[in-house]
A protein has these predicted regions:
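N-terminal alpha-helical transmembrane segments of multi-pass membrane transport
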Residues: 2-143, 259, 282, 286, ...
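Transmembrane alpha-helical segments of multi-pass small-molecule transport proteins
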Residues: 5, 28-43, 68-75, 234-260, ...
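Helix-loop-helix connectors at the membrane interface of multi-pass transporters/channels
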Residues: 8-18, 180-198, 222-246, 277-283, ...
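Membrane-water interface regions at transmembrane-helix termini and the short interhelical loops
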Residues: 12-18, 44-59, 78-99, 147-154, ...
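Transmembrane-helix boundary/entry motifs in multi-pass membrane transporters
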Residues: 16-25, 60-64, 94-112, 146-157, ...
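Helix-loop-helix module between adjacent transmembrane segments
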Residues: 17-28, 32-42, 75-78, 114-118, ...
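Membrane-interface helix-loop-helix modules in multi-pass membrane proteins
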Residues: 74-81, 85-181, 374-379, 383-384, ...
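Low-complexity, proline/glycine-enriched hydrophobic segments characteristic of transmembrane helices
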Residues: 315-319, 380-473
């Protein structure tokens, strides 16, 4: 075992070739991790879920305004950086060139940024907003346009601006100024050398915990949807036990990618995943009609821009229904993105060395926002248009024949509910049920049960596959698209886990940009353990509560980091001006 510390490096302990840690940060993060998992396992269940929901609601009620204000502030700061006088500064030496091609760079940041979530929510969120329109939004938008605009709002400019700010700050301090690739470095212009002590240890530990909570949420979501896809394809039963087994299996795949490293592992998988995801999107686009997709893309963009100013600052301060909606949707998303920002920001910084600030902001904010909007249009608009067209068809047939037809729609078993909205069980223990033709919109809100009536189906992770089934008449195309979607989710899962373990390892090793593989394997396993524990404790709502809670203290860190970046850029600009003045002074005539 060896220990080393210099004026430019944080203390590190090295055990052999494969383990390197910052003694305080690593130990503190592991202790918190063990406590979290122990509490989730020992006290998991309805009571634990209730406490998680109450904590989430308490934070939303008292600090929702902070999430809303900070995310809009991050977007404004990103625009200022891209258009300001520091936009030419390179993240590294002045003569340094980007390490990765633009295509590889984009594939890696997008796969890490929000891949699992986009697949999970691209169908479910537009349906939710369509069925329960957000209260108090701008007039002039019909239900479909409003649902799509709000969905794109949550996945558009704001989260990518946040990632850009965090990634830019880390890259600037790490590659331009030569500081440790660590979150404490971002606070140095404001807090001075105190960040190299215990205060910095706290900041880096917060970054690790926020990352674990954010990634655990995504891994839990991914496990639910992989379970739904395998159930659709192979009849594998759904449930928490199956999902935890899937987390274990896919985490094992992620460890293989960890061993292969950044170039052979994450980069190759990200490039493959982008190709497969693009293929899935094309299937949906041509299945729903290319012209309809292009028309919807333009209309959705206009609707998004129409609501953007109002929604960016909306807290629901004057209406309890609006406040509840903002807390359940916008505040959750903003907190989720903030808890993801240490991971995504650090990863983007790690693969963005050599790019200018303008190139970095443009690539990280604009391109993924456009792709996310197109993706959501392909899936979300197809879902809503299919539903409205079937309703119109049924209405026309009802007027003419009094026998409305839902021909072409698959049938599902829907359970009957009692007066308390509970499924009715028959004497043999199965749910009372009838077979009904459903669109994807109707499916999400229906009490769907398994064909044998033994169990209720979680429609949220399943609705993506229902959309696919209702869009294609050919069983072969349905199986191809469902299989493709399931593989994409698995690959997004693997790249997210691998990328996050690399980022956590960088922080926990004291800012080493290339930490050894042993501790990265440990963090990959830890992410799967946290996701499994939170699923056991209370499912998706427990995962959401963990993300909202972990994001709160880190929001303060990010606000101070923005201040620190502005100061550091100003100092760099002044040094460049001084250098230019010295160079431009003519030689003395008397000399």
């Amino acid at each position: 075992m060896t220990s080393n510390k210099t004026t430019t490096e944080l203390p590190r302990l090295r055990f052999g070739k494969h383990i390197e840690i910052h003694p305080v940060v690593f130990t503190a993060a592991v202790l918190i991790l063990v406590a979290l998992v122990a509490v989730s396992i020992l006290y998991g269940g309805p009571d634990m879920l209730g406490r998680c929901i109450r904590l989430r609601d308490w934070i939303g009620d008292r600090f929702g305004w902070l999430y809303v204000a900070s995310m809009s502030g991050f977007l404004g700061f990103a625009i200022w950086l891209a258009m300001g006088r520091y936009a030419h500064i390179r993240l590294g030496r002045d003569d340094e060139q980007p390490e990765y091609s633009t295509l590889s760079w984009f594939a890696m940041l997008f796969s890490a940024g929000m891949g699992i979530g986009l697949l999970f929510f691209s169908v479910a969120e537009p349906i939710s907003h369509f069925q329960s329109p957000p209260p108090g939004f701008a007039e002039g938008l019909n239900a479909t346009r409003l649902a799509m605009a709000v969905t794109i709002f949550h996945w558009g400019l704001h989260p990518w601006a946040l990632y850009a700010i965090v990634g830019l700050s880390l890259a600037f301090f790490g590659f331009r100024l030569g500081m440790p690739l660590s979150f404490r470095s971002l606070l140095h212009p404001v807090l001075g050398d105190r960040v190299w002590g215990r205060l910095g240890d706290v900041v880096d530990t917060l970054a690790i915990i926020a990352t674990l909570m954010g990634v655990a949420t995504s891994l839990g979501i991914g496990a639910k949807q992989v379970n739904a896809g395998l159930s659709f394809l192979l009849g594998i039963p759904s449930g928490t036990g199956t999902q935890i087994s899937l987390i274990a299996a896919i985490t094992a795949l992620a460890t293989i990618s960890v061993v292969l490293g950044l170039d052979a592992g994450i980069r190759r998988l990200s490039e493959l995943n982008i190709v497969l995801a693009f293929g899935l999107m094309l299937l949906l686009i041509f299945g729903g009609g290319l012209v309809a997709f292009l028309s919807a893309s333009i209309e959705n963009l206009g609707a998004y821009l129409q609501i953007l100013p109002f929604n960016s600052f909306r807290t629901g301060a004057f209406n309890s229904a609006s406040r509840t909606w903002v807390n359940e949707w916008t505040v959750f998303y903003w907190a989720w993105w903030i808890s993801w920002s240490p991971f995504v920001g650090m990863f983007i910084a790690r693969v963005s060395r050599g790019r200018t600030i303008r190139e970095f902001i443009t690539g990280v904010v604009l391109v993924p926002t456009v792709v996310a909007a197109l993706w959501l249009t392909a899936f979300g608009t197809a879902t809503l248009r299919q539903h409205t067209e079937f309703l119109e068809q049924a209405a026309l047939q009802a007027d003419s024949t009094n026998t409305p037809s839902m021909a072409g729609l698959p049938q599902y078993w829907v359970g009957e509910l009692d007066a308390n909205k509970q499924l009715i069980r028959q004497d043999d223990g199965t749910f009372r049920r009838t077979q009904v033709s459903l669109t994807a919109v109707e499916y999400l809100s229906s009490p769907v049960v398994t064909p044998d009536g033994q169990a209720a189906i979680d429609t949220l992770p399943t609705v993506l596959f229902v959309l696919i089934e209702t869009m294609f008449q050919s069983p072969l195309l349905v199986m191809l698209a469902v299989g493709l979607a399931t593989v994409c989710i698995v690959l997004f899962f693997v790249t997210s886990s691998d990328s996050a373990s690399m980022v956590i390892d960088i922080i926990a090793s004291g800012g080493n940009p290339n930490p050894p593989v042993g501790t990265r394997l440990f963090w990959a396993l830890a992410e799967g353990l946290v996701a499994s524990a939170l699923l056991f404790a209370g499912g998706l709502r427990a995962l959401q509560a963990a993300a909202v809670t972990a994001a709160l203290p880190f929001t303060i860190v990010l606000i101070i980091a923005c201040w620190g970046l502005a100061k550091a850029l100003h100092n760099t600009g002044e040094r460049e001006k001084s250098k230019n003045r010295v160079i431009s002074v003519p030689p003395s005539e008397n000399g």
